[in-house]
């Protein structure tokens, strides 16, 4: 609200000083494209003022807006929708050893997957008629544990740069080509868009969403930003061929879609390795576009910042103008935005602590547009455990000056 008032006063002053002869309505609309959908509270006005200030309405072009994909631009997770389709259509290749699918796979995870799914390179997993195999894969994807509760992943990793079960999904498709994975994603997209809102399906013993929807408000926001001269990117911790299939639906091409990029073998097939960032080369999931990794890929791929510097917050002119996300995975790059930090409230503690603290007056909080969550009853534990530390611990959320963010009540739902 503080920033909205400031922008409103500035806009009023500009109007008072404007010459009497105004451009035609059509010319004004082309220069100053407007949002056309409804938002919570004053959010539409807040976003519009950022668009006007950074875009063609003020004579500017080239500002960057970046959005997470899953549960930010769409309701529900498109990587999960693709995995669901693959499990029901026997599309996953059978690995020679489950241990080889992840650098962090435990003996317990290997045993559980081997018992439920089998091994032996070549052919496909018969997941459509092996519910125990499907169960193990879905449980590991969702929780990082086997159906018996044993840890599926163990070892050391930077918890602000990766999470093994996110990196594992592209690794499950090792042996397939990007074109094959794209075709699975396209089939899953058709199926998920046709399913009614609220629909679920059963995978093994798991109940999962059966539908996905593009948010009308986000589609309109992206289109308006593009018309106003912004360069709009998607930055996702999903698999890049999957995300590209969906991002085309909001007018964002592959060149502006950043996600986990699997390295291909000499025959053009996906491997268990992925491209790196920030001075870290090809790796087996050590760094992906996840929390601080999203900042790294934005700095590297959009602003051309190479080496370890890509992990660092950049000066004002080398940061995005608008950032949008829904989860702790997005908190770093959304915080970096200079104009608006757009958050869809999914009750994710670290992100919501930053949003409700609103240290710079530029945070824009919106309930999910479809099936929004109810109000969180307890305050977010910002002063104690909301920050996701690199070693996997949970510590207080700190402001740039080192002060602790106090616990925050959930007020936008």
Predicted features and spans:
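Short, intrinsically disordered, charge-biased short linear motifs at domain edges
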Residues: 17-21, 367-370
């Amino acid at each position: 609200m503080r920033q909205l008032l400031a922008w409103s006063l500035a806009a009023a002053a500009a109007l008072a000083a404007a010459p009497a002869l105004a451009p035609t309505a059509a010319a004004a609309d082309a220069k100053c494209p407007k949002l056309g959908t409804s938002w919570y509270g004053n959010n539409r006005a807040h976003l519009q003022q950022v668009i006007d200030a950074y875009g063609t309405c003020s004579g500017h072009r080239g500002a960057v807006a970046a959005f997470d994909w899953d549960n930010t631009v769409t309701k529900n997770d498109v990587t999960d929708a693709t995995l669901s389709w693959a499990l029901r259509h026997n599309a996953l290749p059978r690995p020679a050893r489950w241990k080889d699918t992840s650098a962090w796979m435990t003996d317990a995870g290997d045993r559980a997957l081997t018992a439920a799914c089998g091994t032996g390179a070549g052919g496909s997993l018969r997941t459509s008629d092996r519910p125990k195999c499907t169960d193990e894969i879905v449980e590991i994807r969702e929780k990082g544990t086997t159906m018996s509760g044993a840890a599926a992943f163990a070892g050391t990793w930077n918890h602000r740069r990766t999470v093994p079960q996110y990196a594992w999904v592209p690794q499950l498709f090792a042996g397939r080509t990007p074109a094959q994975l794209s075709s699975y994603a396209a089939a899953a997209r058709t199926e998920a868009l046709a399913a009614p809102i609220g629909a679920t399906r059963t995978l093994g013993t798991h109940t999962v969403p059966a539908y996905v929807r593009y948010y009308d408000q986000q589609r309109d926001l992206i289109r308006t930003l593009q018309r106003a001269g912004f360069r709009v990117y998607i930055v996702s911790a999903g698999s890049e061929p999957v995300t590209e299939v969906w991002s085309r639906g909001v007018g964002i091409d592959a060149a502006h879609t950043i996600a986990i990029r699997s390295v291909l073998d000499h025959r053009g097939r996906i491997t268990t390795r992925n491209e790196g960032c920030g001075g870290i080369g090809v790796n087996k999931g050590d760094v992906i576009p996840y929390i601080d990794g999203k900042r790294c890929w934005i700095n590297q791929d959009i602003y051309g910042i190479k080496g370890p510097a890509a992990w660092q917050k950049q000066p004002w002119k080398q940061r995005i103008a608008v950032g949008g996300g829904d989860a702790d995975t997005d908190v770093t790059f959304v915080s970096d935005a200079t104009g608006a930090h757009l958050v869809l409230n999914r009750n994710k503690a670290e992100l919501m602590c930053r949003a409700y603290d609103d240290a710079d007056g530029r945070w824009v909080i919106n309930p999910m547009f479809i099936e929004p969550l109810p109000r969180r009853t307890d305050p977010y534990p910002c002063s104690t455990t909301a920050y996701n530390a690199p070693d996997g611990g949970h510590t207080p959320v700190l402001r740039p000056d080192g002060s602790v963010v106090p616990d925050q009540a959930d007020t936008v739902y």
